[in-house]
Design a protein with these regions (language model features):
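Catalytic cores of the polymerase beta-like nucleotidyltransferase superfamily
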Residues: 1-209
Length: 209
C-alpha cells in the first residue's frame, strides 16, 4: 500500500510513502473504477462504489472531484480518455469540478497531454471522450513545452470549440459543425493519423479568412 501528497507540481506527487491499510491506498486513486482490489482468494474488495459505477456506466472520482483534479491535472485528460475507453458517462460532480482545476493544466508537459489524447483517439467511444474534452472547455487550456531550455505555454486544441453550434448546410449535413466532426471521427477506423485527420478536417470552417 502507499499514499501520496501533492504540492506545486501539476502531475507528480511531492511525497510518496507506505500506507498501513488498503483504504488509505485506494482513497488516493483517481476514479472508482480504478479503486477496486482483489485479495489472494480472488475476492473483489470495493470500498468506493466501483462495481456500482461499472453497472451504471458512470465515471466518478474517488472522494472530492475538485480535490482529485487539483492534485493531478492530468486526471482531467484521463477522465476524457476513460469515458471514451469504457463508453461511460461522467458524473455531474466530475463535470462540475473539471473547470475548477483548469489553472493547473499549464503545468503539464505537452508530451503527457499528447499521450493521453492519442490514447483517447484510439478508444471505442472516441466521440464521447472528445465531447467531454471540448464541451468542458478543457481543449482550450494551454500546457507547457520546453524548447532550447526555455519553457512556454502552448494552446492544446482551442479551435475545436468554434465548431460547437456552427451551422451547416442542411442539404448536406444533419448536425452542427461539432457533432458532424464527431460522427466522422467515430466512423473512421482506429488509426491515429486517420482519426486526427478526421477530427481536424473542418476545424477552419466558418473562421475569418
Amino acid at each position: 500500500y502507499r499514499t501520496e501528497r501533492y504540492g506545486a507540481d501539476s502531475h507528480r506527487p511531492e511525497e510518496i510513502a507506505y500506507a498501513d491499510t488498503l483504504e488509505e491506498d485506494v482513497l488516493r486513486r483517481d476514479f472508482t473504477v480504478n479503486g477496486m482490489a482483489m485479495n489472494r482468494y480472488g475476492e473483489v474488495i470495493d470500498l468506493v462504489g466501483g462495481r456500482r459505477d461499472i453497472k451504471h456506466k458512470t465515471l466518478r472520482t474517488i472522494g472530492n472531484a475538485e480535490k482529485r483534479f487539483e492534485e493531478d491535472a492530468l486526471r482531467l485528460f484521463r477522465a476524457c480518455r476513460f469515458v471514451a475507453k469504457l463508453d461511460f458517462l461522467p458524473s455531474k460532480e466530475l463535470l462540475e469540478a473539471m473547470p475548477k482545476a483548469f489553472h493547473r493544466v499549464s503545468g503539464l508537459s505537452l508530451e503527457r497531454v499528447r499521450s493521453e489524447l492519442d490514447r483517447l483517439m484510439l478508444a471505442p467511444a472516441v466521440a464521447k471522450g472528445l465531447d467531454v474534452l471540448v464541451q468542458s472547455r478543457l481543449a482550450e487550456c494551454s500546457c507547457r513545452v520546453v524548447e532550447n531550455g526555455a519553457a512556454r505555454e502552448v494552446p492544446i486544441l482551442p479551435e475545436l470549440y468554434h465548431l460547437v453550434n456552427l451551422p451547416q448546410e442542411k442539404d448536406f449535413h444533419e448536425f452542427d459543425g461539432w457533432y458532424h466532426t464527431l460522427a466522422v471521427v467515430s466512423h473512421t477506423e482506429p488509426d491515429l493519423t486517420l482519426r486526427w485527420g478526421a477530427l481536424l478536417h473542418d476545424v477552419a470552417k466558418g473562421m475569418p479568412t
